[in-house]
């Protein structure tokens, strides 16, 4: 969010190609205004839950083009706002301006990054709500919390969640509906727990 203006200026004004198209596309999508009116029920529920996690909202000032985080009557520059808040705010913005629909595909690298465990769990709940509406998610994670929460959601909703795990030069596929996969992240988490219990 803090590079939003620079990304757009480099491509649209300066005509340089310093940023990958995915960043340019995201910056363009984020500058679209929120739309009023009825939205998919799942999207409205997800937005409500997203705002609960960050206890506020992110908005852009139309005149300055700068992003800020609003929490109650307080306003903070986006540069001093936590990275986890920014990540969640991006998803909220894309839902509010209707850039996302039930056929969208979202890639999130390390969704756990800069979020405390309770927020990670809530974020996974939101991803499940959106996935049930039709949005397809691809997540890359090194977090036991993420894997375990997705496993629990898969069991609770009887929903297939395919998982690919790298083991050396090989890839192993599993489905969380069938159980937790064996991989180094899970093995190390269990090992630490067992070490503490002993």
Residue ranges and their predicted role:
Residues 1-103, 159, 169-198:
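Phosphate-coordinating catalytic segments in nucleotide- and nucleic-acid-processing enzymes
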Residues 72, 79, 114, 137-138:
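Short N-terminal micro-motifs specific to bacterial/archaeal maturation
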Residues 86-89, 121, 125:
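Short, contiguous clusters of charged residues that form electrostatic/catalytic patches at enzyme active sites
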Residues 105-107:
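Walker B motif beta-strand of ABC-family P-loop ATPases
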Residues 109-111:
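Walker B catalytic acidic pair
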Residues 113-114, 124:
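Surface-exposed loop-to-helix/strand elements on domain peripheries
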Residues 122-198:
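C-terminal lobe/lid and adjacent interdomain/linker elements of RecA-like ASCE P-loop ATPase modules
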């Amino acid at each position: 969010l803090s590079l939003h203006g620079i990304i757009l200026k480099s491509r649209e004004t300066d005509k340089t190609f310093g940023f990958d198209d995915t960043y340019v596309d995201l910056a363009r999508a984020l500058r679209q205004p929120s739309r009023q009116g009825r939205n998919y029920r799942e999207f409205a529920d997800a937005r409500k839950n997203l705002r609960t996690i960050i206890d506020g909202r992110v908005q852009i000032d139309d005149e300055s083009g700068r992003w800020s985080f609003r929490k109650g009557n307080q306003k903070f520059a986006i540069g001093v706002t936590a990275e986890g808040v920014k990540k969640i705010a991006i998803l909220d913005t894309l839902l509010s301006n209707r850039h996302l629909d039930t056929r969208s595909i979202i890639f999130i690298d390390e969704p756990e990054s800069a979020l405390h465990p309770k927020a990670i769990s809530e974020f996974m709940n939101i991803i499940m709500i959106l996935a049930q509406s039709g949005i397809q998610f691809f997540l890359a994670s090194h977090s036991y919390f993420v894997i375990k929460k997705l496993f629990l959601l898969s069991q609770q909703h009887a929903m297939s969640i395919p998982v690919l795990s790298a083991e050396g030069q090989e890839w192993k596929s599993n489905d969380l509906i069938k159980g937790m996969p064996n991989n180094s992240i899970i093995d190390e988490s269990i090992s630490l727990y067992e070490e503490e219990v002993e």
